[in-house]
Amino acid sequence: MSDIADKVKKIVVEHLGVDESKVTPDASFIDDLGADSLDTVELVMAFEEAFSVEIPEDAAEKIATVKDAIDYIEKQKAA
């Protein structure tokens, strides 16, 4: 796992209070990890702060899984 993936996983565990073993790449924040819409907004804000990236609302709406978040952040950091 990349540093970005590890950091995303850590943020998800801290913000949602879920067991780390449940935070898999295909895990949906809402369906699998029990997040609600406010949780997802807070996660996006935490990702923005942790990685010094800006995630516009239209992009944030497409981030539904752990892998979506990792892929988006990796793409932004590479740009």
Curated annotation (Swiss-Prot):
Q: Enumerate the PROSITE patterns for this protein.
A: CARRIER, PHOSPHOPANTETHEINE
- Pfam families reported in the protein's UniProt record: PP-binding
Predominant localisation class: cytoplasm
Q: Which residues are recorded as modified (O-(pantetheine 4'-phosphoryl)serine)? A: 37
Task: State whether keyword DNA-binding applies.
Answer: no
What pathway annotation does it carry? Lipid metabolism; fatty acid biosynthesis
Question: Which UniProt keywords are listed?
Answer: Cytoplasm, Fatty acid biosynthesis, Fatty acid metabolism, Lipid biosynthesis, Lipid metabolism, Phosphopantetheine, Phosphoprotein
Gene3D superfamilies associated with the record: ACP-like (1.10.1200.10)
What GO biological process term is on the record, naming one? lipid A biosynthetic process
Q: Which family is annotated?
A: Belongs to the acyl carrier protein (ACP) family.
Against HAMAP family, the record matches this protein to:
Acyl_carrier
Q: What does this protein do?
A: Carrier of the growing fatty acid chain in fatty acid biosynthesis.
Q: What is this protein's name?
A: Acyl carrier protein
